[in-house]
Structures are given as C-alpha cells and as structure tokens.
C-alpha cells in the first residue's frame, strides 16, 4: 500500500483532517499538518481504530433491535470508557448508560447506519454481545493502553470514537453523512415560447434563456454536427437549430448604434407613430438665386424689417432663419449666404428644407448663380417655386425669364408644366400674398406632419463661438419639442440646453417642429448641417458626445471614397452606380454643348452619364463644392481650375480631368467605364507665376518679368499661359533667369524672367503655370 496524505484519508472517510490528526496523536503517531503522509504501519493502526470504532457503533444497534424496552443507550458505556475492562461485570456499563442526555438517542444510531461497509468486519467476532464489546475494547486500547490509568484517560478512546460517529460532534458528522445522499433532481422549468437575441449568444447565455443546463445544449449541438464549448459564441444558424429542436421561436433584435447620429436620426424620423399624434407642421422654405436679384429684400418685405440696409453691399453675411405667420399658419424661411453653405449641409446629409423659392430678376434673366441654384435644388429633390422679381421696373420681361427657365426643365403651369411662377416686386410688396398662398398650397400637397410629443431631433443651420456666451448654435427642430434643460448631442458636441432665443430675439422655454431657435450650453462649436438629438438623460448624452468626438479625432474627418475615373469601373462592378455624375466647364458655350451631347450618348452596361452642371469659365470653388455634394467628376475643356478650386478638390477628393481635345475626354470616360484605362502620366502642378511686365527683345522674343505666387518654376517644366482662366498656349520654357543669371528654379516670393518657346504673345497679368509629368499606375 502506498503512502496516503492526511487530507486524502479524511476525504475518503468523510471527516475533517483535524479529527484524523487527533486520532493519530491518540495512537502515538505525530503528524505536522493535513499534508503529512501516513505510512503503512500507521495507516494499518488507524484503520484498526476506525474498524473497532465502527464495531462499537454497530453493537448498540444490534442490541437495540432486540430490546423490547427501547433503551438504545444501554451498550454505549463500553465505548465511552476504557478503564473498566473486567469481563465478570458485563452489565455494569449498561447501568451507567442511562446517565447521558437523551438528546443523543437518535443520533447514536444514525452514523452506524450510514457506514454499512464497516459492519462486514463483525463476522470475525464472537456470537455474543459481550464478546463483541470486548473485541471493541481490545481494538481501541491496543495502541494506547498505557494511558488508560492516568486522569482523564477515559476520554482518550472517546476522542477516537468521536473521529467516527460518537460524542459532541455527532450532529455535525450526521450532516456530513446526510450530504452524501444524492438530492432529488429539481424539476426543469418550462421552455419559453420565444427568445430574443442580438448578434450572437454563448452556449451558457442560450442555456440560461432556455432554462436548461449548458451540458445538455452542448450534447444537442454535437448531435447536430456543431462542436462548441460553454463559452463559445453561436451564430444565428446554430441558435435557430437548437431552438427549433426545443420548439422555441427565435427573434433577432437589431440594435441601432446611437453614436451614429445619422442612422439613429433617420430611424427616429421614420419611426412608426400613431397617426392621431401627428399634427401639421410649418414648411421650411429656402430662398435662393443670383446676387442682387432680391433674395434678402423679399424676406425683408415679408418680415417688414430693414435687414438689407444693415448689410455690406446688400449681401447676406450670415444664415438667417425666420418664422412668419400668414392666415393663422406659419412658414419658416432660411436665408442662405450663397449656395456653398446650402450645398455643405446637403453634402452632410442634412435634408432640412421642404420648398425652394428661386428668385429671378425680371430685368436680368437667368444668370450663372441662378443655374447653380436650380441644380442644387434638383439634386436635393425639392419642389421649386419661381419668384420673378422686379416686375415694377420698365425693362422687366417676365416672359423672357419663363422662356429661359424652360431650358432647365422649369415649365410654367400656364404653359402646360408643373412649376409655379409668381410675379412679385419685393421692393413695393406686389404679389407677396400670392407667393405665400402658393407656398402654403405646395406644403399642403406635400402633407408635412410631425409629432410634437416626442423628444426633439433636427439639424444645425449655423454655429459660432460668442465671446460672452460661448458656443452658440442655431438649430432647426424637425420633429418633436425642444425644451430648456434637455440633454442634447449636436454632431460631435454635447451639453444641456441652457437658454433658447427665437428669431425675434425673445427668450423661449420650448419650441416645436419646423421652428428655428438659437441655443447655448454646448461644450464646443458644431458644424452647419450636423444632426442634433435630445436624449433621456445627461449621462447618455455625454457618453455619446464623447464617443463621437473621439471617433472624429481618430478619423480626422477622412474624405469619403469619391468617384474618380480611376475607381469608376470598380464602383460599376460592385453595382454601386447607375449613372456617372459629371460637371462640365469649358472656354466657350459651343464646346460645353458639344461635349455634353457626346457624353450623354455613352452607355456602358446600363450605366450612363448624367450632366448635373455646365458653365463657361474657369473651374472655381463652387464647382468643387457641388461635385463633392453630388459625388461628381469635373471635366475642364480648355480651362484651368483656380488655386482655391485645386486646393478644395484635393481636400474633398474630387477628381478633375482637364482636356484640350473633345474626343480624348470622351474616350477617357468611356474607357474608364469599360475598365480599360492603362497606366498613364499624371500631371503635377508645381507652381504659378504672374506676369508683371513684358519686354520685347529682338532675336530673343518677349521676356516676361514674373513674380512667383505659388510653388516654384523650374527650368525643365512645361508651362501654360492662362489668360482670364482660359489656356491660350501650352509649351516649354526657353530661358529662366534671375538677375541676368540662368536659374534652375525660382521659388515662391521671388521675381524672375521667363521666355517661352515659340510664343511671344505674352501680356501683363497673364498667369504662367508650371507643371511636370509623373508616371503613375492606375489603382
């Protein structure tokens, strides 16, 4: 037999290690602790002591069964004392057995019945109870008989007896023996009718939802061909397999990321609500048009204020939001500072306006910004009402305006179209009532409704940092009601609404749908076009705002994946595009029309070219803004982009393609749509110089005295001569000098002399653009 540790022996006999150590000490065997080992001799002595104790416990049980008086404590005395071992007085212990308390009567027999295996040793004893008792005394006193005559010696064997079943710890021992009886398995709970989960569940989580043991689910999964552990995540298919086996329905919950305000905003805006809670809301109207055609004067006449007089040059300096009340109905007007801000809002996905009023001067007709406004409104998908202004002037010709607008698919109702035309005089107030009636008519057709009983959502019209009040934002509530004290997230900022001021400069406590209001209380300045959402508590708003701010900091407002000719074929293959948006700028109107007509004929695999804007002149920043909002490609024919436009295109990742031959532009776009573009040389603009003075020298030609305004001019670079935004010549530099010395390059801020090969028609204020060709490979 191998050595056994104390704690192992105690565990095997279901007693504490302390009692085993005490029993070994009674046998004269010293052990240090529960980790000590018991050798074979000591183990044999300990087993004999245990066997003897078990026999002592069994003897009272046998006598109890034959005792008619039911006195179960009679034979217990031989186990309690070992000093009195006379064989001629077998009945004396029985007489002394009546002294102990009767509380141990039922506990004395229980341990004996719990150790049936130990009773097998009694077959070797004699047939009488006295002989059995004598055997017990001999077994228990043999290891330590020398200690039987000292004081307190009677308790020594009794301590050994306590090691098994007797004494004051019998109750505790009884509890230990009771725990060995296998408990009745609990009745399993009824299966639920349906469980709801999002994304995935672990085996343990699914077992908890089904009120089943994880091991049961693991077995079922194994039988279904899925090997999984208790902490392994299960996909939707595995969850459905298990639940189908149990007959439980499964529902997947789609969680909306509240930090993604755009998605959350759309879900909240399109949330199904009780029709009885919806009320009619005022329409939001944007006034657009060419410079000095009377946009602000119109709004001024409607509000009976003199806003125009306080503005420099009659140009609106900030975004104004005003609300008017006509015939007991309200209309919200937005006055935009040009179309850039409007386009920027649309580029961020903020569809805040319902109706567009296009102001056209009757004496001026359709102008370039008028066309831009039409393209913006059409791209946003808004209904257009044309206000023909300045009809009071003698040279006014409204019919000419209508005729010109038909070219842009704005056909008057009087001519069989669906566009409302309203002749007005903003200065004298003529026709304004009719215009307002038309606005209310269109809004009634659109069925504009909102729920004022919900938490507010909307968009930012403008924002600024005020020295006295801190971050200030002008908001347009699109749905719900905004109250003072509401926790709010605005774009990447957050806070609590501290104060609200309406368009009349009065403090208000709450505002409803389609109402503009200026608020304070944000931690930072948001951007125009940002969404705002009111949340239930400030803690949630703070967490969402901080999360969005940290994400924005990491992303650094990374540019979206704009469409370019390089990746056009990939977008088409992925099925992301049904049409290619193109903006065309050229030197003359004839080139614009020819190029647009040729591009419209291109059709590759059902994808065609859509011309969203055409104009004559250099590519400007407004073109880039429109291209960024519409995900369009800009094509320039015999024109160049301005420095601001080039910088904006780089920031917005807008693709600009410049050509001097029409068929090359057409071939390039068609090849891109077919995915057949080969590696090519890319042009890199390295600098620009302005011609300050020209000197004609015989045998040399015209020397241009230039000042480098951007980048640098190098001796081996190609150059273009640009006059009024139009390329007049393209060639190479013949000489580049500085202070009569040849120079390899001249940097920004320095003057130089330049002659161009085969070109002497250089004039003052011309721009010399230097470029180099770099070989690139299409991605």
UniProtKB/Swiss-Prot annotation:
Binding residues for GTP: 289-296, 335-339, 389-392
Region annotation (Disordered) maps to 44-193
Where does this protein have compositionally biased stretches of type Basic and acidic residues?
A: 53-65
Record region (G3): 335-338
Q: Which GO terms describe its cellular component?
A: cytoplasm; cytosol
Query: Which portions of the chain have biased composition (kind: Low complexity)?
Result: 82-93, 117-167
Q: Molecular function terms in GO for this entry? A: GTP binding; GTPase activity; translation initiation factor activity
Is Glycosyltransferase set as a keyword in this record? no
Q: Where is the tr-type G domain?
A: 280-449
Q: What ranges does the record give for the region G4, renumbered to this chain?
A: 389-392
Q: Which UniProt keywords apply?
A: Cytoplasm, GTP-binding, Initiation factor, Nucleotide-binding, Protein biosynthesis
> What function does this protein fulfil?
One of the essential components for the initiation of protein synthesis. Protects formylmethionyl-tRNA from spontaneous hydrolysis and promotes its binding to the 30S ribosomal subunits. Also involved in the hydrolysis of GTP during the formation of the 70S ribosomal complex.
Name of this protein: Translation initiation factor IF-2
What is the species listed in this Swiss-Prot or TrEMBL entry? Listeria monocytogenes serovar 1/2a (strain ATCC BAA-679 / EGD-e)
């Amino acid at each position: 037999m191998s050595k056994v540790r104390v704690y192992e022996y105690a565990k095997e006999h279901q007693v504490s290690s302390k009692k085993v150590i005490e029993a070994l000490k009674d046998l004269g065997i010293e052990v240090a602790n529960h980790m000590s080992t018991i050798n074979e001799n000591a183990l044999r002595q300990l087993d004999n002591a245990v066997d003897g104790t078990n026999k002592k416990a069994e003897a009272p049980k046998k006598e109890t069964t034959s005792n008619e008086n039911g006195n179960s404590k009679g034979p217990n005395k031989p186990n309690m004392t070992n000093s009195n071992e006379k064989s001629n007085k077998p009945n004396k212990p029985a007489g002394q057995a009546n002294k102990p308390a009767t509380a141990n009567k039922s506990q004395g027999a229980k341990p004996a019945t719990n150790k049936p295996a130990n009773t097998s040793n009694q077959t070797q004893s004699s047939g009488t109870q006295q002989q059995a008792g004598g055997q017990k005394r001999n077994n228990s006193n043999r290891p330590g008989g020398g200690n039987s005559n000292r004081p307190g010696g009677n308790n020594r064997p009794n301590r050994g007896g306590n090691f098994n079943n007797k004494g004051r710890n019998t109750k505790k021992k009884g509890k230990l023996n009771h725990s060995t009886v296998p408990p009745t398995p609990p009745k399993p709970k009824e299966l639920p009718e349906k469980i709801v989960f999002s994304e995935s569940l672990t085996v343990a989580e699914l077992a908890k939802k089904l009120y089943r043991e994880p091991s049961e689910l693991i077995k079922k999964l194994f039988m279904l061909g899925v090997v999984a552990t208790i902490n392994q995540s299960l996909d939707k298919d595995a969850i459905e397999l298990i639940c189908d086996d149990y007959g439980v329905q499964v529902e997947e919950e789609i969680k909306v990321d509240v930090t993604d305000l755009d998605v959350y905003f759309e879900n909240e805006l399109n949330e199904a609500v009780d029709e009885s809670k919806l009320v009619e809301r005022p329409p939001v109207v944007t006034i657009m048009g060419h410079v000095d055609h009377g946009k602000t004067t119109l709004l001024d006449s409607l509000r009976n204020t003199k806003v125009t007089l306080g503005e420099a040059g009659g140009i609106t300096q900030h975004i104004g939001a005003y609300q008017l009340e006509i015939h007991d109905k309200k209309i919200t007007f937005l006055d935009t500072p040009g179309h850039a801000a409007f386009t920027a809002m649309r580029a961020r996905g903020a569809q805040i306006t319902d109706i567009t009023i296009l102001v056209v001067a009757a004496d001026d007709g359709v102008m370039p910004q008028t066309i831009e406004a039409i393209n913006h409104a059409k791209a946003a998908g808004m209904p257009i009402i044309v206000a023909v202004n300045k009809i009071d002037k003698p040279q006014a010709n409204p019919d000419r305006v209508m005729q010109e607008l038909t070219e842009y698919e704005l056909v008057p109702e009087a001519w069989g179209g669906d566009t409302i035309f309203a002749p007005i005089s903003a200065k004298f107030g003529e026709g304004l009532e009719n215009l307002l009636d038309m606005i209310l008519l269109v809004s009634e057709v659109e069925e504009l409704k909102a729920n004022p009983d919900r938490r507010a959502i909307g968009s930012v019209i403008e924002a600024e940092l005020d020295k006295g009040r801190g971050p200030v934002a002008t908001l347009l509530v699109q749905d719900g009601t905004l109250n003072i004290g509401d926790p709010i997230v605005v774009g990447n900022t957050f806070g609590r609404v501290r104060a609200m001021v309406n368009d009349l400069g009065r403090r208000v406590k709450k505002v409803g749908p389609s109402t503009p209001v200026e608020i304070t209380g944000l931690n930072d300045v948001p951007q125009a076009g940002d969404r705002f959402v009111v949340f239930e508590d400030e803690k949630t708003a703070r967490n969402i705002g901080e999360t969005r701010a940290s994400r924005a900091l990491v992303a650094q407002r990374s540019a979206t994946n704009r469409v370019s000719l390089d990746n056009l074929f990939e977008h088409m293959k992925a099925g992301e595009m049904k049409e290619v948006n193109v903006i065309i700028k050229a030197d003359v109107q004839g080139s614009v029309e020819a190029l647009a007509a040729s591009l419209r004929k291109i059709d590759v695999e059902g994808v065609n070219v859509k011309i969203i804007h055409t104009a004559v002149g250099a590519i400007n920043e407004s073109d880039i803004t429109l291209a960024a909002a519409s995900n369009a490609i800009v094509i320039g024919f015999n024109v160049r982009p301005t420095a601001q436009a080039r910088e904006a295109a780089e920031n917005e990742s807008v693709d600009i393609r410049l050509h001097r031959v029409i068929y090359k532009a057409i071939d390039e776009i068609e090849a891109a749509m077919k995915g057949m573009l080969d590696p090519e040389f890319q042009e890199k603009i390295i600098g620009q110089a302005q011609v300050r003075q020209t000197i004609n020298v015989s045998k040399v030609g015209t020397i241009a005295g230039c000042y480098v305004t951007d980048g640098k001019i190098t001796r081996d670079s190609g150059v273009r001569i640009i006059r009024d935004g139009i390329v007049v010549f393209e060639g190479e530099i013949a000489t580049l000098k500085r202070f009569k010395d040849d120079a390899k390059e001249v940097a920004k801020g320095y003057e130089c002399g330049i002659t161009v090969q085969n070109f002497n028609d250089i004039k003052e204020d011309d721009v010399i653009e230097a470029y180099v060709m770099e070989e690139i490979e299409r991605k």
